[in-house]
Amino acid sequence: MPPTPLQSEPANLDGVRDLRRPLADWLTSKDNRLFSRNIVNRVWGYFMGTGLVEPIDDLRATNPASVPELLNALSEDFANNGFDQRRLMRNIMTSRVYQLDSSALPKNATDTRLYLHYNVKRLPAEVLLDGIDDAAGTQERFAGVPLGTRAISLPDSNFASYFLDTTGRPQRVIACECERTSTPNLAAVLHLLNGDVVQRKLTDKNNRIAGFITNKTSVEDAIR
């Protein structure tokens, strides 16, 4: 029996030496809406805090999208334009729904699925650490990579960092988005308040604060 992709015809592998090629061709076929819907839902979820389908990687027939017409339209545009992720992100970020105020009205304060207001979300662990470095003008040091390598550029979770582990970095032992956690916890709060990572960046003699003091920068200019 020849291998048959989901919702597709049996694959003709005569003369094929690298089986990854027909797999890639099927994944990126315009007729394969499984791929485009999955990517669109995942990118939408990253920007909006919740996916059109939740959980993000549970796209089964019995778990419909909150706004199926929107998922279909974005998926079709994504597939018809060469799976251009920049275009997809631009479409999302220039939309009215992405630019909604996060302040909710009493009648829609609990909504997280219909996007009646922007859903406030916590920064992922890697983005949070990089953001602290950007604000402080410091560089994080990870063993085995050059100084200044950003947390979002680390190839895997084997680079030791108590900060990243405490604030929700996944260990990447299962293929599920659910492994990453954004749930607040006491350890993360205490580490941000008085942990050694933030303390080290605040006391770094070459940080942005030291530069402001040396240059006698006014508060207004420092904020600006």
Which stretches of residues belong to each language-model region?
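N-terminal start-of-chain detector that recognizes signal peptides
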Residues: 103-106, 160-164
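Short, glycine-/Ser/Thr-/acidic-enriched flexible segments
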Residues: 157-159, 196-197
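Long, His/Glu/Asp-enriched segments that create or flank divalent metal/ion-associated functional microenvironments
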Residues: 136, 140-145, 150-157, 163-169, ...
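Primarily short, surface-exposed interaction patches in extracytoplasmic proteins
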Residues: 1-145, 170-171, 177-180, 196-224
